[in-house]
Structures are given as structure tokens and as C-alpha cells.
Amino acid sequence: MASQEHPNWLTALLADTRPPPKLFAWSPANIQPKLDEGIDMGSSNSDEEYDNDACVCPSTDSDQRIYIIGPGNIGRLYATHMARHPNALPITLVVHRKELLSQWAACEGVGLADLTSGKIFLNKRFTVEWWTETRPPYGPVKEVADGKKLHNVFISTKAEAGLSEADRIRRYLGRCSSVVFAQNGVCKLWPPHGPLYISHRYPSGDTPTFSACVVSHGVASAGPFLSVHAAPADAYIGPVFWASDPESPWRQPSDDFFIRHIATTPLVNTKQVSSGEIWLLQLEKLVMNAAINPLTALLRYKTGELFTSYGSDDPLARVIDKLLWQTSAVIQGLIDHETSHSVITSYAEQMSQPGTSCSVPKVRKKLTERFSQPILKAKLYAFGLKIFEHRSSMLQDIEAGRKTEIRDFNGWIVDTACFLGTGLDVSVHSGLTGLIERCERFDKMELGRALL
């Protein structure tokens, strides 16, 4: 079978030859004729911490400012704690709807309830903007970053919107820009498709540094600008694509300012890793998401309920087994593919002892074992039982009537199998994608009949 040349998202972007749009940065002042500057935040007590005085005041200095695009649960988590960084920088929250500007004006700021400490962190010392091609009819007229370049961008939207958001702002990105994707799924800028996208959208020598942040913290929404940090965990950050130094083209951006800033942000426990390691971590998280999310959504189960039976007579256990065999085959095929050589080499160099050369074939063999079906199954069952009461994000999306991330989980498996072009069976992933998009609901027996 011949491999597919490009996935649909890349085909659409390659066909788009329009110049990047000029974007206006609306603020609450564009919604209300005058916004009261003095907002009573109340008096603090042992259960509430207000960061009014601790946070850096708003500044027009876009060289230092952090822009968080998509301040949902993960965005609020990082905004809250980046504002408490020992060397805190001014932060702008970029919302996706105009109405959120009015809601921001009326609320007490970003709220993060920490269940471990029992504290509620409240902070209103952020700038909030809505970026649009529409010029505001009244109030101050301001272009994004005053028409200059954005330096520190943290994109924490749903996975589907991540690259489209970065693409929309490419007018304001360049070699000085560091863009971090903190989302589920596998970043679209990895080989094999990322380099072609970059060369199509950016002039040579003016490419931003693009990184991925894999977040394991459990954070739930409790309303607009309010989240609950229910399950503290850890996170990892590493580079995906960067403008190489002609003198040392293989050198990774370990000294990238924004990556270091995130890695030193208190209380989010974000570890800086190599390009190869962050790729593997994204793949491992994808394995969990591609199993747990669609199955819990279709069965309306809590996560742990998926893993109460190993028996071959249980239709759900058989579905999980087959799904993992298919996942394993696709990821192993990707590991062996020539387009993965650079990230495999990055990981091999990280794993090698000082003064010794790395063996890429040996590393590939170890990674093939790491993504074997029995290993993936053991990790999945252990993880699922550990978070037994957890309600997956896809289950919550289905119940709320929202669009899911199924195309970035199981759809990615299907697309990658198509790219590899070796005739791999991905029928379970393809079937799950269709069932989720039709908002089906099954019991275990019905699910087995639909997928086996």
C-alpha cells in the first residue's frame, strides 16, 4: 500500500497562500466605555491567597510578556503559578470569545482551588485580550504585540485548535519567538509533516522555537476563569522544532529562555527534557488517551471501570487487547521509519554515557519493546486503576455536547498508519472515531459487537 502524501490538515495549510492576518487585541475597554480601575478584592484569610501585590504589573514590553492562548484549565494552572515565579513576568491571557472580556471585568480574576493545601489562589493582575481581525468600533485600538513580535507564547487550547492558533498568529512570530504547545495528542510539528509546514509558513532563518509540554496534573473547571487542581502530578517540556545554529545544527535549545522559565515555575513540577524524550512521552500519553477517552465516553464509565476484568470472555477486555495491538504496531512502525531518525538520535544521545557513542539501532530495539502490546497493556491497566474515579475529558465533552479530541487521539493512529503505508490494521481506532462522532452509547456487549 502506498503511503498518503499529506494529512488533511497539512493539505489545507499548504493550499492556503494568503498572507497572515493583521490581528487586533481587544480588551475589556473595548466592550465597556470605561472600566473601573479599582476593584475590591476583599480581605485575605488562611484559605484564600490574593496575588495582587506579588504579581508583576502589566507592561507594554512584549519582549518579556508571556501570552497564554486558551486560558482553560491547564492555562489557568500555569498562569497562576507563573505569576508566583521568583522572576515573574507580565502575563496576558488571550481568550477565544468576546463575551469573556465582559466576564473578566465582572469576576475576581483567575481562581485556582488547590485541594491538597486547601487554598484558593485568586489573581486579577493579568491583562486579558481577545485577538480578532475585526477592528474595535470604540475604545483603544491596539494591534497584537503593537505590531511587533511575540516572544513567549503558551498555547493551551484543545488539541485540535493548537496549530491553527499558532498559524493564525504567525505574522507575530519569528526567530525570537518561543511557542509552547501544552495539549493532549501528538504535536503536529514533529516529523514527518512538521518540517514541511515550517518551510511553507516561515522564511529560512526566521523560524520560532516550538516546544511541547506534556502535563499530567488533574485540573477541572469550576466556572469561567475558575479551576480546581484536583490531582497534583508533574509535567515535562522539550523542544519539537527550532532554528538551528549553522555552527552546530544538531544543538538543541537547552538555553531557551521560555522553556527554562516554565521549568523553574513553582508548584507545577515541570521537568525539562530532550526532543527525543518529549516525543516518546507524548506517544505514551497518546496510548492512554486513545484507550481511556473513547471507551469511557461510549460506555459512560469512570476510568477504573474499564479495567475490572482481564478475562478473554469479557468483550471489553477483548476490545482493549485488540486496540493496543493496533496502537503498538503503528507506533513501532513510526519508530522504525526513516523520518523518525532525528528524534530517535536525540533520545539515543541523551541515554548514552559520557564519552561513549550511541547506537541508534540498539535504541530503536529498546523503544520497540517499550511500545510492545504487553508493556502498553500493563501500563494502561495500572494507570487506569490508579485513577479509578476519574471522569475522562472526552466523557465530559460528550455529556456537555462539546466537540471531542477523538481526531487527535484515535484519528492520529489512523492517519499515521496511512502515512506508513504498510497496510496496518487500525479498524478499532477507525471504528471508535466514527462511534464517538455519532455520539453513540453502548454497553460492553454492544461495544464488542461494533468493534470486534
Swiss-Prot record:
Protein name per Swiss-Prot or TrEMBL: Ketoisovalerate reductase BEA2
Domain of life of the organism encoding this protein: Eukaryota
Keywords recorded for this protein, A-Z: NADP, Oxidoreductase
Consequences of knocking out this gene: Decreases the production of beauvericin.
Binding site for substrate: 289, 293, 393
Gene Ontology molecular function: 2-dehydropantoate 2-reductase activity; NADP binding
Gene name as annotated: BEA2
Positions annotated to bind NADP(+): 70-75, 405
Record-listed E.C. numbers: 1.2.7.-
InterPro entries to which the protein is assigned, alphabetical: 6-PGluconate_DH-like_C_sf, 6PGD_dom2, Ketopantoate_reductase, KPA_reductase, KPR_N
Source organism per UniProt: Gibberella fujikuroi (strain CBS 195.34 / IMI 58289 / NRRL A-6831) (Bakanae and foot rot disease fungus)
Family membership: Belongs to the ketopantoate reductase family.
Induction entry: Expression is highly repressed by the histone deacetylase HDA1 and the beauvericin cluster-specific repressor BEA4. BEA biosynthesis is also repressed by the activity of the H3K27 methyltransferase KMT6.
Keyword Nucleus applies: no
Active site (UniProt): 285
GO CC entries: mitochondrion
Catalytic activity, reaction form: (R)-2-hydroxy-3-methylbutanoate + NADP(+) = 3-methyl-2-oxobutanoate + NADPH + H(+)
Function: Ketoisovalerate reductase; part of the gene cluster that mediates the biosynthesis of beauvericin (BEA), a non-ribosomal cyclic hexadepsipeptide that shows antibiotic, antifungal, insecticidal, and cancer cell antiproliferative and antihaptotactic activity. Ketoisovalerate reductase BEA2 catalyzes the NADPH-specific reduction of ketoisovaleric acid to hydroxyisovalerate, a precursor for beauvericin biosynthesis.
